[in-house]
Every structure is written in structure tokens, then in C-alpha cells.
From Swiss-Prot:
UniProt function note: Core subunit of the mitochondrial membrane respiratory chain NADH dehydrogenase (Complex I) which catalyzes electron transfer from NADH through the respiratory chain, using ubiquinone as an electron acceptor. Essential for the catalytic activity and assembly of complex I.
Keyword DNA repair attributed: no
Source organism per UniProt: Homo sapiens (Human)
Gene Ontology process terms (BP): aerobic respiration; mitochondrial electron transport, NADH to ubiquinone; mitochondrial respiratory chain complex I assembly; proton motive force-driven mitochondrial ATP synthesis; response to hydroperoxide; response to hypoxia; response to xenobiotic stimulus
Catalytic reactions on record: a ubiquinone + NADH + 5 H(+)(in) = a ubiquinol + NAD(+) + 4 H(+)(out)
GO molecular function, one term: NADH dehydrogenase (ubiquinone) activity
Topology relative to the membrane: Multi-pass membrane protein
Name under which the protein is recorded: NADH-ubiquinone oxidoreductase chain 1
Pfam families: NADHdh (PF00146)
Length: 318
């Protein structure tokens, strides 16, 4: 039975990820006054499956100078971690109900850095290595703000368990009392998933694709799949933390409908940003985090820590 549950979680995620790729190409197409993929199947709906067949039937290239073990392990690790992050997410019932669910997500997502670092180093290419170093610095930096924002929300919910966040938001979304945190969280998730305007790791103009330049066929597809799975996961987590949906035992299907709708809207915002914004300069990216986000999040964390103490110390008004 646990294996069936695991498959029932993984298969829909992979299908959603495939259609997210198609949706992105369609949105980019219409934003640029063209059609996008519209040949394979009705309205191009079978395009993701055609791409998958093409990539996985091609011969994978292994550069002669690369470190083969790490070169093959890196993309596999990237997708494994991307799928593993879904286990504690309540939709409305998690696959594994962890008491430290948020801590698990934070710790596991930081492991994704290793797959990028290994891929860049094992490729034995200057472009790949520079792209990997950029991606690692960016991901580690933005994890700092993500952790502080999570701590601030934990002070409001009182537990590391993600299911508790749903109970906390029965009457009021956490987005309303903590909207500055929510805005910084959303921008940090863009940076964490290496998306526009923070896609410096894949800077086509200067790095010719970045850390995955030496990859082709199946391993390249695995990196792509991991990236898009992470996008959906991050938006699902954002929905759980800031836009919590009330769970009604009498009509559980309503929870799923609202939950999926919010996640789709956030994911569409990711794609819209991709079409509209240019790429940041690397120094601007780091300046935004260390000079702006970090002081702000620390100040807000102190505010959320001190508020309950201050209120509890006020004598009752008789």
C-alpha cells in the first residue's frame, strides 16, 4: 500500500511538470505574438511526451575528460530531491506526516546544491564550473532569507508541522499579517529555483547554458524535470504557508480544488515574470539579498518575537 501511495503522489507530479513546460512555451509564444507548440497532437498537447521520447531515446554523451560517476549521479540526485520534497506537504493529507516537516523541506532543499555543484565540476568545462559556482552561491544565499521567513511564520503557527499551518489559517491567511515576508519569500523562491530574473546560472549570453552545458539526452531531461518540479513544489509550499485553505471533512474535494487553483495562479505568475523581466546582474542579485532582504527579514523576525511578549506583559484593562 505505501508503494501505491508513493506512485499516486509521484505520477501526477510528473504529469503536471510535463504540462507546465508546455504551458510555459505557450505563454512565451503568445506574449511574443506567435503560436508556440501546436503541431504534435491537438493544440500541441502531446508536445511534452514527444520531447520526452526524443530525449530519452537519444544516446547520452559522456565527455572524455569528465568524472563519469558524479556526471551521471548529479541529474539523478536533482530529480530525486525534487520529488522527495513533496512527501510532507499536506494536500490535505501528507504522504508522511512529519512533526518537523518544514525543517525537513529546508534541509532537503539545501541538498539540491550538491547536484548543481557536482554537475558543474564533473563536466570539466569552464562554462559549467562558473555556472555551478554562481548557482551554488545564489542558492545558499537565498536559503538564509527563506529560513528566517519560515521562522517568522512558525512563531505565528507555533509548530514545524505543515498540517498545523492549515489549522492556523482557518480564519485568516498568514499573507495578511505578514505581507512583507510573503513578498520577500516569493522573490526568494524565484532565486532558489534559478528562474528569471535570477537565472544567472544559465546565462545563455555569457555562459552558453551554464552548469548543464555538457549534458544531452536523458541526463539533460532529468535536470529540466527537477527544475520544473521544484517550481510547482515551491508554489505549493507558498500556498500552504501564506494562503492556507480550510479543510472541511464533509467536502474534502473543495480543499483540493482551492489548493490547486492557488498553486496554479502562483505558477502562472512565475511564467509571467519569465516573459516580462530581464536578467539581473550578479552583483545586483547579491546586493538585493545581503543589503536589503537580510536586514528586513531579521527586523521583522524580531518584531514577531517581541509582539507576543509585549502584549502578554501589558496588564489587563479593568
Amino acid at each position: 500500500m505505501p508503494m501505491a501511495n508513493l506512485l499516486l503522489l509521484i505520477v501526477p507530479i510528473l504529469i503536471a511538470m510535463a504540462f507546465l513546460m508546455l504551458t510555459e512555451r505557450k505563454i512565451l509564444g503568445y506574449m511574443q505574438l506567435r503560436k508556440g507548440p501546436n503541431v504534435v497532437g491537438p493544440y500541441g498537447l502531446l508536445q511534452p511526451f514527444a520531447d520526452a521520447m526524443k530525449l530519452f531515446t537519444k544516446e547520452p554523451l559522456k565527455p572524455a575528460t569528465s568524472t563519469i560517476t558524479l556526471y551521471i549521479t548529479a541529474p539523478t540526485l536533482a530529480l530525486t530531491i525534487a520529488l522527495l520534497l513533496w512527501t510532507p506537504l499536506p494536500m490535505p493529507n501528507p504522504l508522511v506526516n512529519l512533526n518537523l516537516g518544514l525543517l525537513f523541506i529546508l534541509a532537503t532543499s539545501s541538498l539540491a546544491v550538491y547536484s548543481i555543484l557536482w554537475s558543474g565540476w564533473a563536466s570539466n568545462s569552464n562554462y559549467a564550473l562558473i555556472g555551478a559556482l554562481r548557482a551554488v552561491a545564489q542558492t545558499i544565499s537565498y536559503e538564509v532569507t527563506l529560513a528566517i521567513i519560515l521562522l517568522s511564520t512558525l512563531l505565528m503557527s507555533g509548530s514545524f508541522n505543515l498540517s498545523t499551518l492549515i489549522t492556523t489559517q482557518e480564519h485568516l491567511w498568514l499573507l495578511l499579517p505578514s505581507w512583507p515576508l510573503a513578498m520577500m519569500w516569493f522573490i526568494s523562491t524565484l532565486a532558489e529555483t534559478n528562474r528569471t530574473p535570477f537565472d544567472l546560472a544559465e546565462g545563455e549570453s555569457e555562459l552558453v547554458s551554464g552548469f548543464n552545458i555538457e549534458y544531452a539526452a536523458g541526463p539533460f531531461a532529468l535536470f529540466f524535470m527537477a527544475e520544473y518540479t521544484n517550481i510547482i513544489m515551491m508554489n505549493t509550499l507558498t500556498t500552504t504557508i501564506f494562503l492556507g485553505t480550510t479543510y472541511d471533512a464533509l467536502s474534502p474535494e473543495l480543499y483540493t480544488t482551492y489548493f490547486v487553483t492557488k498553486t496554479l495562479l502562483l505558477t502562472s505568475l512565475f511564467l509571467w515574470i519569465r516573459t516580462a523581466y530581464p536578467r539581473f546582474r550578479y552583483d545586483q542579485l547579491m546586493h538585493l539579498l545581503w543589503k536589503n532582504f537580510l536586514p528586513l527579514t531579521l527586523a521583522l523576525l524580531m518584531w514577531y518575537v517581541s509582539m507576543p511578549i509585549t502584549i502578554s506583559s501589558i496588564p489587563p484593562q479593568t
